[in-house]
């Protein structure tokens, strides 16, 4: 990176802060959000009428928190791309495009969950079966799984940008990519497994990998008292 760009980088968001936000929102929108919905749980999916009878606003909480996860992921990827653009432009662009695909799919899905599902539920419409993620066969699950599959592709592609001296970050990002893409591919054969015990274990495994990767980035790349030139070589390894 040129010396001329350094003052702007000094004022920019630290990579560690963006990663910490990702970890926090992944935890809140995932395990914590899921636990809170148990205060007013939905029974196992049977039909739209049963869903409407048990609908409650708290069931939307994980999706509202999911917007925070979406935004923090965009911040993290934007920072990674900015730091690696000069030396790894092609790989950085691939990461950026895959993340944009993730953001588009998840934004549409979560908007449907927090804005359209309540409207359909209040109206008692049977169309809610085609939108709510309480139904494991709803097409919105494809947006979810393929959206996070795209994000997994982005983390996989981004792994080499962290250099050979950060092997655990690289491994966690690659593992997250493998799990995310495998989940998306599996959905091509049917989505009924998503709300079974194997689906729950897959969900917990993804969250564990994703949160661990974000925490590793936040800890390893936290601001230190280093010379300016050294501090700007975080992502200089060519992929």
Spans of features found by a protein language model:
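Hydrophobic, aromatic-enriched alpha-helical segments typical of multi-pass transmembrane helices
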Residues: 2-239
């Amino acid at each position: 990176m040129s010396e001329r760009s350094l003052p702007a980088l000094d004022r920019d968001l630290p990579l560690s802060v963006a990663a910490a936000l990702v970890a926090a929102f992944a935890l809140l929108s995932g395990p914590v959000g899921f636990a809170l919905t148990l205060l007013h749980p939905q029974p196992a999916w049977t039909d739209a009428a049963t869903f409407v009878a048990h609908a409650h606003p708290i069931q939307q909480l994980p999706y509202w928190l999911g917007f925070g996860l979406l935004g923090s992921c965009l911040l993290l990827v934007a920072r990674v791309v900015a730091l690696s653009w000069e030396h790894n432009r092609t790989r950085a662009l691939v990461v950026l495009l895959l993340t944009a695909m993730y953001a588009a799919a998840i934004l549409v899905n979560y908007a449907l969950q927090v804005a359209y599902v309540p409207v359909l539920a209040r109206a008692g419409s049977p169309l809610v079966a085609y939108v709510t993620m309480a139904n494991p066969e709803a097409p919105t699950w494809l947006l979810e799984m393929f959206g996070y599959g795209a994000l997994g592709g982005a983390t996989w592609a981004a792994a080499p940008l962290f250099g050979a001296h950060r092997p655990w970050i690289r491994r966690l990002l690659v593992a997250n990519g493998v799990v995310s893409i495998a989940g998306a591919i599996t959905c091509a054969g049917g989505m009924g497994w998503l709300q079974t015990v194997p689906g729950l274990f897959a969900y917990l495994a993804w969250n564990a990998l994703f949160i661990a990767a974000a925490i590793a980035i936040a800890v390893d790349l936290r601001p230190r008292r280093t010379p300016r030139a050294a501090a700007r070589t975080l992502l200089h390894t060519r992929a």
